[in-house]
């Protein structure tokens, strides 16, 4: 039997001269606002995606114009930490070089810009570089932005975990100089044919995207089990001693294709802090060598582990790391939400967590969020920490500066909104009009949808109960909907699949309850379930656990068998 043909992206990567392609030539062309099909795949490794305004597609087609192309650029910000000075630079770019005039906090602790014309890409990347920021490897078949729990209470432990996250990000960056040459005008260095340009990735990089997170228990705001590779911090006497390693998580799937499914990571065991890089590289290189390069829908690490088996994968990782896993340590994983308002850290500094609905920082009628963040950045002496729930922490505030910071936040609408438990635990992806994959609305519709959920909870007397609700416009799962107690995944305009049964802590997936239904049906189903939950729930029982216990949906134990079955 002949070998299967590789996926097209594999040939593109091989022939790209380490991610250069013809990006430079495409950038210089003013004939079109787009890049060539091949370069559209390669620019992802540089941190951005080509998009167009789908609200205007038909109108422009009638006018015989090409789509209104623009680009979404995502920064690499390990652990979501940036300085006020950097934020002012980020804000200036958003205000002057993008059509969206906004900054979007993501579900992976970074920010992205929408509505960038091709002519502004280079200026933006050079502007980020002046602030010691970049977008390399924020997208593409590489290790993406490394998440780390911002944990503003245990400052010392957070600092130790953050250093690990930053080292992971730096160590696993692509070594190619394509980014520096194309965007920063650095000269191309001559290399010999046999020189190793990419010691970890090789010429074809990874089969697919690779996501990594560092969690600091008891918090699980990074949703560690949804990542390809996770490190759960283990502390003794307040000091970091190592991590429980998890591998094989991932949210993406394809509607109607049962061979694709979301999956939560497996626990592999405890590793010492000094061995983190060895194990990270080992897991990545096993995926590099064993991952599926013929079918991109089956190319994530989760499928590699399912197809080759847990024990075989674990043994190979240990061989490559040169270290054996120890038995995993007992840790408690709990809340995935953020602590809103003021929290005092162990160092006496204060941290203010701001709720940013769907992560969109923009000046709007009645709320000048972007102006407020700018004003705070001008006087703040600590740092900013973006969370994986799309929120912002004003971190490291001295006691004497609290009143000033809070005053600015309240004045500009960053503080003071009525925030229900459920709204504070809920996130949505961008979806329409810019995401080319979206089948339905998410960010634009989500606030209204949560209003309905809040009303139903109030009606049924369960407003005190936080429920994790997430919405995406497609099944790629950017807002991790399959790990939500209530997950809504776009199927068509105004229609969603409704998923129930994940647990509150993020250690069990949900399962489809109703397919392809509209708002009225969704709300009717949830109203009936909330009524039952109010009466039948056990003491302390969360909504997701309730739906499994009473048989509304079956628990997903083994995603490969249970998610669709």
Swiss-Prot record:
A single GO cellular-component term on record: sulfite reductase complex (NADPH)
Biological processes per GO annotation: cysteine biosynthetic process; hydrogen sulfide biosynthetic process; sulfate assimilation
Binding site for [4Fe-4S] cluster: 429, 435, 474, 478
GO molecular function term, any single one: heme binding
Chain sites annotated for binding siroheme: 478
Record's catalysed reaction(s): hydrogen sulfide + 3 NADP(+) + 3 H2O = sulfite + 3 NADPH + 4 H(+)
Main function: Component of the sulfite reductase complex that catalyzes the 6-electron reduction of sulfite to sulfide. This is one of several activities required for the biosynthesis of L-cysteine from sulfate.
Family recorded in the similarity comment: Belongs to the nitrite and sulfite reductase 4Fe-4S domain family.
Protein name (database record): Sulfite reductase [NADPH] hemoprotein beta-component
Native source species: Shewanella oneidensis (strain ATCC 700550 / JCM 31522 / CIP 106686 / LMG 19005 / NCIMB 14063 / MR-1)
